[in-house]
Amino acid sequence: MPELSLLSALDAARIQWYHFKAIIVAGMGLFTDAYDLFCIAPIMKMISQIYYHKDSIGTALLSTSYAIALLGTALGQLIFGYLGDRVGRRKVYGLSLLIMVFSSFGCGFSVCTTRRSCVMVSLGFFRFVLGLGIGGDYPLSATIMSEFANKRTRGAFIAAVFSMQGLGILMSSAVTMVVCLAFKNAGEGSSEKTNVAGLETLAPPESDIAWRLILMIGALPAALTFYWRMLMPETARYTALVENNVVQAAKDMQRVMSVSMISQITEDSSSELEQPPSSSSYKLFSRRFLSLHGRDLFAASANWFLVDVVFYTSNLLLSQIFNFSNKPLNSTNVYDSAFEVAKLAAIVAACSTIPGYWFTVYFIDKIGRVKIQMMGFFLMAVVYLVAGIPYSWYWSKHEKTNKGFMVLYGLIFFFSNFGPNTTTFIIPAELFPARFRSTCHGISGAAGKFGAIVGTVGFLWATRHHEEDGFPDVKRVRIAFLILGGVCIAGMIVTYLFTRETMGRSLEENEDEIVSTSAGSSPANELLRRQY
């Protein structure tokens, strides 16, 4: 059967240049995603000194500034995940990138510079739109990479795409440091009051340009990748199994990859009468879908929700616990807080985050997804408990260079990325049928981003009370750490009870579909029935 031959050829294909090209093209979207999502912490430090120098930013406004992009990301995952299955992965892949490019520039050119409230509303709007594009990139990149990859190294390829986030975090920190240093050195260091956005402030006027420049630079990687995305063909699995056009699928793969048997598949398929696309034997969220895939969807969504509660809260700790704003404000040290937060983020990314990603790339197809995910949740729980119980001892003097705490903080990110933060991105791209794959990945990812909102907003409100020296209340931070440890334990339990291993199996094997001969089967379902 031509479909079976095509999928078998893809699963057995040797590693070749196009696989690495696909990793770069798909990964640059996630690179941009990470840049845009994680540059906001140091930027909010700058905005607080430029527009709110007499008062600190309220918890409600700070929570909204973090949550608005995450909300857009969740909606983008749902919308583009659905569109990826409805009209094709390739057709909407470039659209998500364009949204990121234009909204990044929109953030920089926030349309009102006369009042700080207007600036924040404009920035919030464009951050929300930016989130839509970022969210769209998650299910499309994961699905495309999973459908291009061979069976033996599929996990490593998807993990490599996701690992570009680490480089995006590192780049956002580097850009922030360079911009802050350049603007600081260009300033005169005076303490004279100036006018920024209609407000009297010690911050120099050019500081209002600095944070906008950081945001706009995030558009460049996405813009440079757009052309190459448009050259990518539709995935063979979507064309063959959803559109029922195995001839076109074989031709597309022959154009970009050297796969044995592709030429023969094209010849054999051309001699057969093409069947028109038929409706799926069951619909999304139907009783049959839930009986076959409900457990997998629950496990993928719950685990992503839990890990994002922890991961995004951990990132927020960077700008809240490590307080660098105790110097008197003048026209140059308006950049100091942002620089210090970005520098620490760069150190954590280089020493913990990026190595964690690449440990997963190396071990994912050797150890398996479930074992890595359980190990990551367990060790993160241990680190949170070790850091949380004696928290007041670590920070009794609030030493920003406390080496013991910094090591523990870095281990959180290492075991997050050599663990559930990466595997929750991989598993939903491998479990579901081709016609539901992008949608289910989007649902799982959206659950994760709602977890990120819960963690981010919850932590900000839980630690809103500060001590006399301006640091968050020690008791509240300790409780937050212990709660995060409990969340990790819950993730380990959910993984153990509900998550299925996908290593070493084809995507069609992982679908685990049971097709009845009495039901009206599509060619894709008939393929699965004959194969198994």
UniProtKB/Swiss-Prot annotation:
Location of the region described as Disordered in the Swiss-Prot/TrEMBL record = 509-532
Q: Which SUPFAM superfamilies match?
A: MFS general substrate transporter
Please give the organism.
Arabidopsis thaliana (Mouse-ear cress)
State the protein's purpose: High-affinity transporter for external inorganic phosphate.
From the Swiss-Prot or TrEMBL record, give the protein name.
Probable inorganic phosphate transporter 1-9
Q: Name one GO biological process term.
A: phosphate ion transport
Record GO terms (molecular function): ATPase-coupled phosphate ion transmembrane transporter activity; symporter activity
According to its UniProt record, which protein family does this protein belong to?
Answer: Belongs to the major facilitator superfamily. Phosphate:H(+) symporter (TC 2.A.1.9) family.
- Intervals, Cytoplasmic compartment: 1-22, 84-91, 146-154, 229-292, 365-371, 428-441, 500-532
**Keywords assigned by UniProt?**
Membrane, Phosphate transport, Symport, Transmembrane, Transmembrane helix, Transport
Other remarks on record? Although related to the sugar transporter family, it does not transport sugars.
Membrane topology designation: Multi-pass membrane protein
Q: Where in the cell is it found?
A: Membrane
* Entry keyword annotation includes Mitochondrion: no
Q: Which residues lie on this side of the membrane: Extracellular?
A: 44-62, 113-124, 176-207, 314-343, 393-406, 463-478
Recorded hits in PROSITE patterns, A to Z, give: MFS (PS50850), SUGAR_TRANSPORT_2 (PS00217)
Q: Where is the composition biased (Polar residues)?
A: 515-524
